[in-house]
Amino acid sequence: MKFFAFLVLLALAFSYDGNAAVNYALRYCKNYNPSYNKYPGVDCANFVSQCLKAGGFSFSGCSGKDSKGMLPAVSDLKSCLSKNGWSKSSTRPGAFKKGYPFFMNAYSHAMLATKINSGSVNYAGHTNDRCGDVTISSGVTYYYL
């Protein structure tokens, strides 16, 4: 059974396309995709969910999905990532790449990394719509495969 779980996690790691997620994020970071629900003032997890879907992430087994299959609540997105093989770290791990999600302020805000620099991460996000801004490195929880 452990070997099977390893194969599932390995398949997840190779089926997610971070570049596709970033391309989606940069296309919709300043506007909203009309194909999905909009949550004015609290759209961050919904937007990151859309980016992850564009990258090929499957939300199977996740609770809290809206009518379009996205996760509008940060807590549900965090739980879904953990259930689907993503690890987390309070320091930026070497495995963290562009196209991966991260959270600030004790999981109250979700964003997607659009570029990784030696000392910072550029990101896209909704609520206060951001497109390629640079984030601080404190108070961040990174998710990675």
Regions found by a protein language model. Give the residues of each.
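...with weaker cross-activation on analogous glycine-rich loops/strands in unrelated enzymes
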Residues: G64-D129
